[in-house]
């Protein structure tokens, strides 16, 4: 018989993995629609590369800021995850309203910085739920990362 706590931890893992898939799907979303964006904004190949690389740069910046200020230790983890996911969505939406290259790059930087709040915080969150099956739980989250980042393609 499964104890209530075990049911809760698997529910938490399932919901967190789903959240990771949905938020991490924005990682390479610009790459999958690069042709349409380059036509809409009249961008060259170099500028499209900047849009793709801006997410990685934003992730590095976001991870440094998050760790420097120990955000996952200061804020309740559920709130931080929710905040990060909302920021990912809003930052990704910005690219729909951009009219120039600078706004598009800022949108992608903000997306990356927001993703840096979501993924590491989710790892910490799930590690607090699992003692015995922590390796399996971490593997599921890494799988969610992989599926999410590949989702746009």
Task: Name each model-derived stretch.
Residues 107-144:
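Cytoplasmic helix-loop-helix junction between adjacent transmembrane helices
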Residues 63-102:
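Conserved MFS/SLC helix-loop-helix module at the cytosolic interface between two early adjacent transmembrane helices
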Residues 24, 28, 112-120, 150:
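Small-residue-rich segments within alpha-helical transmembrane domains of MFS-like 12-TM solute carriers
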Residues 16-24, 92, 100-112:
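Helical-face signature of the major facilitator-like transporter fold
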Residues 20, 52, 56, 85, ...:
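Small-residue-rich transmembrane alpha-helices and their cytosolic helix-loop interfaces
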Residues 44-52, 77:
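Juxtamembrane helix-start elements in MFS-like secondary transporters
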Residues 11-45, 62-66:
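Extracytoplasmic
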Residues 28, 55-64, 149-150:
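Residue-level signature of mid-helix packing/kink "hotspots" within the transmembrane helices
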């Amino acid at each position: 018989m499964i104890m209530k706590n075990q049911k809760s931890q698997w529910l938490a893992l399932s919901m967190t993995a789903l959240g990771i898939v949905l938020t991490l799907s924005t990682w390479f979303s610009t790459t999958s629609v690069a042709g349409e964006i380059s036509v809409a904004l009249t961008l060259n190949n170099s500028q499209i590369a900047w849009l793709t690389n801006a997410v990685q740069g934003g992730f590095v910046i976001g991870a440094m800021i998050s760790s420097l200020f120990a955000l996952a230790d200061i804020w309740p983890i559920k709130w931080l995850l929710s905040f990060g996911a909302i920021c990912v969505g809003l930052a990704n939406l910005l690219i729909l309203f951009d009219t120039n290259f600078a706004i598009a790059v800022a949108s992608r930087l903000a997306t990356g910085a927001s993703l840096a709040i979501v993924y590491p915080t989710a790892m910490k969150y799930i590690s607090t739920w699992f003692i015995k099956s922590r390796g399996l739980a971490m593997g599921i989250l890494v799988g969610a990362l992989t599926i999410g980042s590949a989702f746009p393609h």
